[in-house]
């Protein structure tokens, strides 16, 4: 338990300068969301202004630095949260932010536009629901 607390403190200490500089008004943290049409639910890490733009902000840890191409599922997930939040609040979120802290303390910031990933979200959901229907 002590090691876990120390690791969490390290992550917090590494992220703090980024958060102090870039984060603005926080709309929610660790909030349960759902989407009636998509029939999905989840718990978003944070919805806040990032560099002045309302954003879904997701925090990740990694053993090593990540290539942008490795993050596609994270972008799809964050886009889903943006859609869920919009359905619940009628506030549109166009920007998604993934913050990754590696074991050596490196912080990576990936900022994307939600619309780039909505077709992939639709594709993933269609594949899932087709699997559920067919039982395969």
Where are these regions (language model features)?
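Mg2+/Mn2+-dependent nuclease catalytic core
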Residues: 31-135
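A short linear-motif detector with a strong N-terminal bias
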Residues: 8, 24-27, 75-79
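Structural motif
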Residues: 1-2, 21, 88-91
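Single conserved hydrophobic/aromatic residue that forms the stacking wall/gate
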Residues: 1-11
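Short, conserved active-site entrance elements at the starts or edges of catalytic domains
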Residues: 12-34
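Residue-level preference for beta-strand/loop junctions
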Residues: 3, 25, 38-40
């Amino acid at each position: 338990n002590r090691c876990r607390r120390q690791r969490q403190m390290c992550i917090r200490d590494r992220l703090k300068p980024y958060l102090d500089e870039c984060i603005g008004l926080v709309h929610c943290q660790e909030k349960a969301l759902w989407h009636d049409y998509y029939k999905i639910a989840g718990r978003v890490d944070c919805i806040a202004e990032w560099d002045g733009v309302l954003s879904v902000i997701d925090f990740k840890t990694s053993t090593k630095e990540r290539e942008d191409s490795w993050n596609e599922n994270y972008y799809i997930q964050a886009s889903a949260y943006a859609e869920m939040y919009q359905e619940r609040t009628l506030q549109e979120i166009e920007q998604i932010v993934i913050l990754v802290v590696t074991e050596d303390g490196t912080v990576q910031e990936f900022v994307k536009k939600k619309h780039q990933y909505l077709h992939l979200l639709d594709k993933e959901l269609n594949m899932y629901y087709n699997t559920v229907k067919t039982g395969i």
